[in-house]
């Protein structure tokens, strides 16, 4: 894995420098960090050690149980987001559509489609929530990305399922043919 866990892209990231966390948030961040660090160690993924990255990670973990829990469940996902630098920029609607369509196209059956789309959705929701909690995206950008991905997920799933239905049952016709 590349420099994500040691800071790599975060040396130039727009680092939010919040005041010290209030004690309840600091305690939550500590618990969430410990859970993530343990899961990362089990997965063989080095946890964040770079100071700038760790400060941001603590802020995000303090603000979002969803992000912290997702990262603890899948530390490789966080490493992929860090290595790919996708946390550093917004995703345009066309890019969201391409990512989701590509994931849907790889699926060979409905169960795989649903699993792969859930996995991608979690990754993208974590990315979007991270950017929001870190102060790297404003509310308008966050809502636009959530909407673009929601539209893309619904559209890609419907298109793929419809294509499978057409292939197995034929194209629906009116009673007149």
Tell me what each language-model feature is.
Residues 1-177:
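Non-catalytic regulatory/linker segments of enzymes
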């Amino acid at each position: 894995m590349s420099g994500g866990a040691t800071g790599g892209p975060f040396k130039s990231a727009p680092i939010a420098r919040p005041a010290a966390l209030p004690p309840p948030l600091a305690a939550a961040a500590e618990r969430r960090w410990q859970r993530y660090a343990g899961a990362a160690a089990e997965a063989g993924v080095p946890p964040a050690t770079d100071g700038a990255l760790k400060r941001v990670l603590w802020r995000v973990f303090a603000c979002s149980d969803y992000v912290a829990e997702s990262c603890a469940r899948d530390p490789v996902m966080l490493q992929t987001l860090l290595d790919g630098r996708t946390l550093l920029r917004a995703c345009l609607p066309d890019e969201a559509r391409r990512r989701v369509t590509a994931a849907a196209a790889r699926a060979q059956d409905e169960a795989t489609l649903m699993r792969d789309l859930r996995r991608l959705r979690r990754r993208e929701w974590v990315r979007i929530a991270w950017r929001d909690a870190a102060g790297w995206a404003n509310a308008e950008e966050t809502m636009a990305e959530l909407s673009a991905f929601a539209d893309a997920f619904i559209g890609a799933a419907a298109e793929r399922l419809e294509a499978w239905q057409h292939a197995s049952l034929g194209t629906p016709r009116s009673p007149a043919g």
